Amino acid sequence: MLASLHLLNRYVKVDDQDPVELAEKITRIGLEVEGQGPLAKGTKLVVGYVKECIEHPNSDHLHICQVETAPGEVRQIVCGAPNVAAGEKVIVALPGCELEGGKISSGSIRGEQSDGMICSIAELGLDNRLLKEEDKAGIHVLPEDAPVGTEALSYLGLDDYILDIGLTPNRADCMAMQSLAYEAAAVLGRKVTLPEVKKYPEEKSEIEVHVETPLCSFFGAKLVKGVTTKESPKWMQNALLASGIKPINNIVDISNFVMVETGQPIHMYDYDKLVKKAFVIKTGFNQKAVLLDENEYDILPEDVIVSTDDGIGCVAGVMGGNDTKIDDNTKNIVIEAATFDGAALRNTARRMNLLTDASQHYIKGAIDTMSSLKVLDRCTDLLVQYADATTIYETVHTPLDETRKTVTIELSRVNGLLGTSLTVKEVSDIFDSLCFEYTLEDELFTVTVPT
């Protein structure tokens, strides 16, 4: 699991911690950090302003640029990018900057002095598979109000640090950044602050949900109308990049971000592409279907399917169907949050060779069903904020068992399992730091499993 410290800092203050020391503390509590490092690679990167750009006299593709890299400080840089032009704010690697491709130095390029390099996003060491095509094709042009001389990675929000955490099977809950935040808060002696989720007036829903297989223990669907498809905010795009997920658009990005934040996979359907406005979760299909990646797959009777209009709306927990996908013209959507059987999904995902981020959450048991309704509300709130959603409908869902589970354990059992000599107060302090609800009678703890 890739954990962004910038994202973690949204829930618990960690930006005053040395990342290496924080990684050691997290490892000591049983969450092994297997790798770590900065999100983007590069030192001495600043925001520059291209004051002048002319053609290189000895080249048919190079340009000679006069670039202001600090107030009143102009340097000449030779650049071969086709989209460089006067008046642009750009990312400049100063001499001495170390990028993945090597160290930048001053020198002569076809007889003209060049003191630095104007960069693309791709040259900053980000995973090329997660970048947009325009970020690979030429230099990255910054907004006009980008302050000249500012540290570029900080300005872009890419000065992040990533922990690669190897989660054992019993800690699948930490696939949710909010759960990881509680662990970090406990080890640092701090409090977690979760985002406030705004509730909106709701109209009676126009959709139906029917579950016809025991392999789906919960299914919730929420209709939201009036959305606009556009770019998601930069902070959200950066959070997804840091989590190893490619940003697509605000609708898709919100669904992926909510999964990263809460651990609950989200799928969205274009409501206007549905005829019957009903979702039937069942098995028994034996046909071919084109999914979101535009490839055709064999659907077998044992596969759990979210059926729409008697067809394949989604291979449950794995990938959505192509017929109901979100596109640039989408105005009305249905949000799905569900709990599917992990073993059944594992067989389907492996056969299709589609071990997606969503399927991994189901397979590893990261789903907290009791939080599913809250997750739908979180998703809705983000759609209002960043997709201009106008009309919200009631959530339609199958019965939800909200009985909280409890675990009873004696202090002697705790110490016997851990090989420790903890006192009642020490164990109580640990439960308090993790925000666990519990009762204590003599040395017997009854702990309510968190949700």
Stretches found by the model and what they are:
Residues 122-123, 129, 141-142, 229, ...:
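Conserved catalytic alpha/beta cores of large enzymes that bind or transform nucleotide phosphates
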Residues 184-213, 387-414, 418-421:
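Terminal amphipathic helices with adjacent charged low-complexity linkers/tails
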Residues 1-198, 334, 350-355, 366-369, ...:
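Phosphate-backbone binding interfaces of nucleic-acid-interacting proteins
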